[in-house]
Amino acid sequence: MVHVNPIVKSFEYGQHTVTLETGVIARQADAAVLASMGDTTVLVTVVGKKFEEPGRDFFPLTVNYQEKTYAAGKIPGGFFKREGRPSEGETLTARLIDRPIRPLFPNGFKNEVQVIITVVSVDPEISPEVISMIGTSAALSISGIPFNGPLGSARVGYVNGEYILNPTVSQLVDSQLELSVAGTDSAVLMVESEASALPEEVMLGAVVYGHDQQQVVIQAIKELQAEVNKPVWDWAAPVQDETLVAKIKDLAEAGLTEAYQIEVKQDRYAQVGVVKNAAKEALLAENPDANTREIDGLLGSLEKKVVRGRIIAGNPRIDGREPDMVRALNVMAGVLPRTHGSSLFTRGETQALVTCTLGTERDAQKIDSIMGEYTNRFMLHYNFPPYSVGETGMVGSPKRREIGHGKLAWRGINAVMPTAEEFPYSVRIVSEITESNGSSSMASVCGTSLALMDAGVPIKTSVAGIAMGLVKEGDDFVVLSDILGDEDHLGDMDFKVAGTRDGITALQMDIKIEGITKEIMQIALQQAYGARVHILNVMDQAIGSHRGDISEHAPRITTIKINPEKIRDVIGKGGATIRALTEETGTTIELDDDGTVKIASSNGEATKEAIRRIEEITAEVEVGTVYNGKVVRIVDFGAFVTILPGKDGLVHISQIAEERVANVSDYLEVGQEVKVKVMEVDRQGRVRLSMKEAAPKADAPAAE
């Protein structure tokens, strides 16, 4: 019998019991943790390579998150009946886990590390994201791989003015906020949220609340780590050659300082390249055996130091702006003639061409996940082609970054979208990033708001987004509004805020250092508010509210109500009736169980014809009414006449004419159109008709 030594740690966390177990499953991995929150269970494995690949100049961390359908007691769809490529939701969760753990690996660590999170059981009320992050933190902490954790994670809701820790799926329905926060015992590292235009102080309070509550997680992982007691790898950061550092500083510092006074991005990049290459050539001429990778790394560090030093010293930013200035804006709506809505939003060297397409309910995205099936009427797709940064590259299916940026923009806009009752259309937004130098996701938010208004979508109000940055050295710090790409990767904090004039709709924050206090975040959020209002003012000059009507090229949806019992009549046998209706009128028809009928067409006459025919099909036969009917069958005792679609009645032989009729065929033939009057509808729905009563009476003879 194989001997196993399980180590288990359980603790109460909000409404749920969390259990972390190791030592039983996946024992050949560097670490494996079976983490549970209620009945939602994930298996997290961590494997790291002991040796670094020669010549590597980056940290190859991979986070794979996979939801197995068996976790929810389901069998996958499709021909192969097995899980395929990651869904959008799985990709987003993988990014959510990657972002806070990446900065906790030590500088200079470049060994390959792979984290695999597998959802093996799921309670439909408890989403796997939080326990996946907790399990990942625990697995990394006990793996022996150099890791400056542990990390805690929490989800925060906000209902009736109260914060809720790790709300259930049902509780989130009524929540004005869904915020995920991760951090160490002393610092917040990552925030991801969607909100119903909440004030800055409520959002900041949620971040602080979530960070405070997750300390119990961090303590439990520390106790698990002590019990497992696995030796940490014998790894040390590469020793820096101080002589080489000094030489590089002498060769390149002045040139880099001058290069970063060039405001145009492409020209600046070119000059930075010239300075770096000159320094490298000088060093290689002096020592041909010098490590070029080390030189490149030190040049990058010097570049970062130069840029940060200028900002902290109070000098103008890279492009000449003051810290709180937003780049020049150029905003246009209705730029494409045949799309249903469009906009071109330009902020400095960042530009988004955004289109809006309206469709019917049939065009909505149907999603079948382990948490259940649902329909998404509002879709936002973000594309980042290589030409947007002046490069060549692969073009194809969206990458993780594009999926993540698209979802962030979606969160920013979703709070102002109309309900299905207010606007019965499916909406697809596509944001094409045509230029990029910082914060293209927030440009997508602004462009989406404009395109929706141009399409006539009745959104509640305009939404704008802004990306903020931070440079902190000791106690000195500078908050930057509308950061450039260079300021993003050279700074200490990157956070993106989308919202209306009334509050925040989406907040994403990634913090790379410790020591970011609540006060610093508060200053940053207030500065972001000022920038957001400035952008909204410019946007409102281009288009201040949604257009009064949708585009002439968009399908117009007309809604009518019918008796729910008549739905089967509209559908017909095997769908024959509705198929004929849509083909012959050129419309799209959708039926709901409550009798709601939606007819969509860009042709008004086609819509009217479809409505007329549906009303005919669903009309009730009225006693005493005269109808134009058509003979469909002749029998010995009379004739059957269709008076409405699917409604036949019998004209008895005695009701065909005033005189006595011996043979029905002498008076009627199949296909003949006749006027008939409804005499009776019996309890079984059988209709008795009369031609005799429908015929105009002969004038009475004139009196003698």
Curated annotation (Swiss-Prot):
Gene3D superfamilies: GHMP Kinase, N-terminal domain, K Homology domain, type 1, Nucleic acid-binding proteins. InterPro entries: ExoRNase_PH_dom1, ExoRNase_PH_dom2, ExoRNase_PH_dom2_sf, KH_dom, KH_dom_type_1, KH_dom_type_1_sf, NA-bd_OB-fold, PNPase. The lineage of its organism: Bacteria, Pseudomonadati, Pseudomonadota, Gammaproteobacteria, Alteromonadales. One of its GO terms (molecular function) is RNA binding. GO terms for biological process: mRNA catabolic process; RNA processing. Keywords: Cytoplasm, Magnesium, Metal-binding, Nucleotidyltransferase, RNA-binding, Transferase. Its EC number is 2.7.7.8. Its main location: cytoplasm. PROSITE patterns: KH_TYPE_1, S1. It catalyses: RNA(n+1) + phosphate = RNA(n) + a ribonucleoside 5'-diphosphate. Its cofactor is Mg(2+). Component of the RNA degradosome, which is a multiprotein complex involved in RNA processing and mRNA degradation. It is found in: Cytoplasm. GO terms for cellular component: cytosol. It comes from Shewanella halifaxensis (strain HAW-EB4). Involved in mRNA degradation. Catalyzes the phosphorolysis of single-stranded polyribonucleotides processively in the 3'- to 5'-direction. This is Polyribonucleotide nucleotidyltransferase. Residues 555-614 form the KH domain. Residues 624-692 form the S1 motif domain. CDD domains: KH-I_PNPase, RNase_PH_PNPase_1, RNase_PH_PNPase_2, S1_PNPase. Belongs to the polyribonucleotide nucleotidyltransferase family. The keyword 4Fe-4S does not apply. Mg(2+) binds at D488, D494.
